Amino acid sequence: VRSSEEWSRLGGGLIVVLALGTVLAVMAPRVLGLAAGPEVEIITALKRTEADGLSVMLPGVSTPLTGRTHRFARITVRLEPGGQRAEALATLDFNGKLGKTEISSLGVERVPFVQKDGVWAPEGSAAPRLAAVVAALEFRRRALEAGDTSALNRLVGRDAGVEGTQLDAVLALGRRRYQSQAWYIRMERDEAVVTERWRLEGVLPSRPVDEQGERSLSLLRDGDEFFFSPTLM
């Protein structure tokens, strides 16, 4: 039977071990980063999100873009002068949803990184380009459902337009409901090509309407945003 003094020493030793473990957990990323260089630390940070999960809040949208599975591959890192900022270029294979909309995406992603307190971390989202495309798609869906032509005009590129018979058919409906059931996205360097599976419900003076289908959409990058081109439909 151990004496109270022996139990006290064991308890003190356990406290020391736990304290060391906490210090190592905090300091390990910094130590590894110094030993391996920023490129390895940035790549490790991106790959870590595959286990931690990916959830991105979009501006003006209460529901986050949430991934079920995602994988970064072919990652390269570009360090900026000064050594405090960098950019990771990668391919991102993503499957998830935004609200009730299923999303599958494959293609190019560019992730800005900054060094904070000796640790490299994404400056914002770990999938900023995917988030920008999904935000544009969701804003379009909302504007179509609301019949908001001013909002629709803000979503198109400089040389694009919002006119067309398909758009007129949507806006002609009363009690309109426009659902994007799925978006299948292919991300290129400066462009995104999307197949949308949609459902449109509403009423005309002569009859109710309940239609479903698929359409192809194209978005072009302008800075950090994506705009529809040549048309919204």
Label the predicted regions.
Residues 39-96, 149-197, 204-207:
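Short solvent-exposed beta->alpha transition segments
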Residues 2-4, 87, 99-131, 191-193, ...:
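Short beta-strand edge/turn micro-motifs at domain boundaries
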Residues 96-98, 128-134, 201-204:
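A short local loop/turn or secondary-structure capping micro-motif enriched for an aromatic residue
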Residues 70, 104-106, 135, 178, ...:
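Short solvent-exposed loop/turn micro-motifs enriched in small/polar/acidic residues
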Residues 28-37:
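Aromatic-capped interface at the extracytoplasmic side
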Residues 11-29:
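Hydrophobic membrane-insertion alpha-helices, especially the h-region
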Residues 121-149:
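Surface-exposed beta-loop interaction hotspot
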